[in-house]
């Protein structure tokens, strides 16, 4: 969320949408505070379900406005015909994780809304990565995917960019399966 809201914030700022820039950059700054405290050994802040839902609602609203402004307005910087695909790239971690987890739960005849440890961050932590390492892997992935999608938009159509993101989703699923199998193997061995 921090990278996505910061990206939207700077884009809104560069294009004169100051109210949305303020919302985006304030939210991004707030999330930096969460990261600061949650990576310390002594202090922790728990956002909870309500905080996560509000965060998701605000990011969804900012995403809709980002796409809308790219379709309907004149810009100080180049307009993004590929704004929907760039938004998907910015939000690929939660989108991919939700799709993967819902699919696995349904295939296992469980409610897609019942909590479990199938989320990718649980798989990384259960395989020996720290919370900090896992978080920075997700940050790096989000920055790399978004930057690459933004760069490739000059050379590829939106359809080709979608195929690129579907390929990344396939790799995400494969990685999740590998991590889940390693977790099962470790459980059996112990």
Model-identified regions with their sequence ranges:
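Alpha-helical transmembrane segments
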Residues: 1-127, 131-190
């Amino acid at each position: 969320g921090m990278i996505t809201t910061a990206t939207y914030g700077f884009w809104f700022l560069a294009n004169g949408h100051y109210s949305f820039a303020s919302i985006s950059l304030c939210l991004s700054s707030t999330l930096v505070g969460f990261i600061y405290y949650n990576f310390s050994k002594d202090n922790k802040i728990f956002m909870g379900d309500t905080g996560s839902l509000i965060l998701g609602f605000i990011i969804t609203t900012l995403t809709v406005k980002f796409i809308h402004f790219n379709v309907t307005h004149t810009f100080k910087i180049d307009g993004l015909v590929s704004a929907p695909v760039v938004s998907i790239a910015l939000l690929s971690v939660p989108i991919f994780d939700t799709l993967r987890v819902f699919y696995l739960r349904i295939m296992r005849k469980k409610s897609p809304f019942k909590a479990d440890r199938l989320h990718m961050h649980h798989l990384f932590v259960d395989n020996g990565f720290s919370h900090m390492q896992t978080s920075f892997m997700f940050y790096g992935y989000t920055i790399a995917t978004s930057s690459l999608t933004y760069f490739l938009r000059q050379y590829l159509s939106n359809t080709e960019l979608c195929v690129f993101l579907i390929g990344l989703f396939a790799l995400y699923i494969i990685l999740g399966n590998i991590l889940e199998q390693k977790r099962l193997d470790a459980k059996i061995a112990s």
